[in-house]
Regions:
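Active-site phosphate-binding/coordination module
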Residues: 100
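Exported/periplasmic ABC-transporter solute-binding proteins
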Residues: 26-52, 56-61, 65, 69-73, ...
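N-terminal secretory signal peptides that target proteins for export/translocation
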Residues: 1-5
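Bacterial N-terminal signal peptides
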Residues: 6-23
């Protein structure tokens, strides 16, 4: 019969052995990501988890402006991947971020896209706005979506912002803007070039990049929020976005890359 002392030793040995075989509990990481990342965020998360197996990023997609408002008002997102640099900078100024500066991770591009075989996006903004076959013209919300601001700036640059008003269909974010074209609710849309690299949309219809002459770049920045200050994976994920692995994923999905991003 085992004595109490021997039984205690056995229990301690069993517990010690299992401590080396049980997997570490995954630590959640709440990420707010701009909608233009929707087609590659799963690939980015999977690649990050290879470097940090105990991380479990939970991603919400939406308009950068909406996430800005939510984080400013205390939403518990730990990382914010914005489609611009301005919203992260504002959160830093408001004291709602742990980062001291946004980390640039991608440069977005906008493209004209149509599924109508009779409509050629290569004709350009002015011609498409004037085309009577184009009854609805989709852009993202210029107030809350950086890609919407870029679309408005391009239309203003080409002198057709006022003319397009009667045809405008405004998406809450850039993903919804693409859906308007995809479902036939708009004959033409200004969408993110990255979205056209997705498995779902690649090869659908015709598209043409919108010239960036005279337009500011759509530089996209990431920050660790105040809520993420105590989670090492928040800073780890932001650093990962500057790694060769992440940059290759972003480039493959139609994004430009900022110079000087560090691993």
């Amino acid at each position: 019969m085992f004595s109490m002392k021997k039984l205690l030793i056995l229990l301690l040995a069993w517990t010690f052995a299992w401590s080396f075989t049980l997997p570490a509990l995954a630590r959640p990481l709440l990420v707010a990501a701009a909608s233009d990342l929707g087609y590659c965020i799963d690939e980015l998360v999977a690649a990050y988890r290879k470097t940090a197996p105990d991380a479990e990023p939970k991603v919400s997609l939406g308009a950068s402006g909406n996430f800005f408002a939510q984080i400013r008002n205390g939403a518990p997102f730990e990382v914010f991947l914005s489609a611009d640099m301005d919203y992260p900078r504002q959160l830093i100024k408001l004291g709602a971020a742990d980062s001291t500066a946004p980390a640039p991770y991608a440069i977005g591009r906008i493209a004209l896209w149509s599924l109508d075989p009779a409509i050629d996006p290569a004709r350009g903004l002015a011609a498409l706005v004037a085309d009577e076959r184009v009854k609805r013209f989709a852009i993202a919300n210029p107030v809350t979506a950086p890609y919407g601001r870029a679309a408005k700036a391009a239309l203003e640059r080409d002198g057709v912002w006022d003319k397009v008003q009667a045809k405008l269909v405004v998406g809450e974010n850039i993903a919804q803007t693409a859906q308007f074209v995809q479902t036939g609710n708009a004959q033409v849309g200004i969408v993110s070039f990255a979205s056209l690299h997705s498995t779902k949309l690649k090869g659908s219809g015709r598209h043409a990049l919108v010239s960036n002459n005279g337009l500011p770049p759509i530089e996209q920045g990431a920050i660790v929020t105040r809520a993420g200050a105590g989670n090492p994976h928040a800073a780890g994920f932001v650093r990962f976005l500057g790694s060769p692995t992440a940059r290759a994923i972003l480039a493959r999905n139609g994004f430009g890359l900022p110079a000087g991003a560090a691993e």
